[in-house]
Amino acid sequence: MALDYASIIEDNQTPVADYVLDSEVLRMSLGLSRDLGARSFLLLEASAGGAYAGFMDGFLDWYHGALGIRMTERESRPRDRFLYEISLPDGRTVQRSRSNLFLGDLRVGIGFRPNPGLQTVVSLTVPTSTGPVGYGRGVPSLNLLNTVGAELSPRVHYEGSVGLGFTPRNGSLASLQRELFVAATSGVRVMAWGRNSAFANLFYHSPYYHGTTLPSLDRRELSLDFGWIVQTRTGGEWRLGMTEDLEPGGPGVDLVLRVGKSF
């Protein structure tokens, strides 16, 4: 179970295209798994989300000012106003609307554990989103994810993954969409004291689009998750973390607050 709340500002301009995204985004997800045997399991993941004008712009303006950081992209936008608009090189303009709350796509899959340090999951994402156009995949998609884990020392655990995905082109941006994707993660968890641990995780995703001339859409995504984990007496975990966008360069996700619970 996880809850993410993010404040996002994107303002990309090229001589032939323009992209503005000013929004606060909510995502809640719940994942369930059931063992089929010692080395296989089924999984199900459901989610809900929302896209809002929000309330955090004033705080973020103060925060950036306190750090001496000037963000002209935020200064050019009115506070707590939603906008999601893409102007493309071919003259088309695509707009997305905000939505208070909607159901997300449903993910089902089967996993295999050949040994304690390796896991493979094959999953299908079903287009069940009830949100406005652009907030769900719109078509079924396939994913293969391989994850490895290793104890580097009694206090340090490493985990990395490589995933391949296929999503058929669809919607108003179909001619610019890529269909094959690669994602990878690499991270460590360091035991601090008692049931407390710190974690950091680097995330990579190949570009989603091509030919838009907009860096936020045509380039790869690279981000860093970091935060704190508290293990419960029953074996579950509470996670509190943040995410920092590293690439593409320029303003992106200002702040992501993430809370997760496993049982």
Task: Label each residue range with its predicted role.
Residues M1-R27, V94:
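Surface-exposed strand-loop-strand hairpins of Gram-negative outer-membrane beta-barrel proteins
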Residues H64-V94, L173-F263:
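Outer membrane beta-barrel transmembrane domains
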Residues S47-E179:
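Outer-membrane pore/translocation modules
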Residues S23-R27, L103-R107, V139-N143, F181-A183, ...:
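Transmembrane beta-barrel architecture of outer-membrane proteins
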Residues R39-L44, P116-T120, P154-G160, G194-A200, ...:
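Repeated loop/turn-to-beta-strand initiation elements of outer-membrane beta-barrel proteins
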Residues M1-S7, L44-A48, T120-V126, G160-F166, ...:
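Transmembrane beta-barrel strands of outer-membrane/channel proteins
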Residues D4-P15, A51-A53, G117, T125-G134, ...:
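Sequence/structural signature of outer-membrane beta-barrel proteins
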Residues M28-R34, L44, V108-F112, V122-L124, ...:
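Residues on the lipid-exposed face of transmembrane beta-strands in outer-membrane beta-barrel proteins
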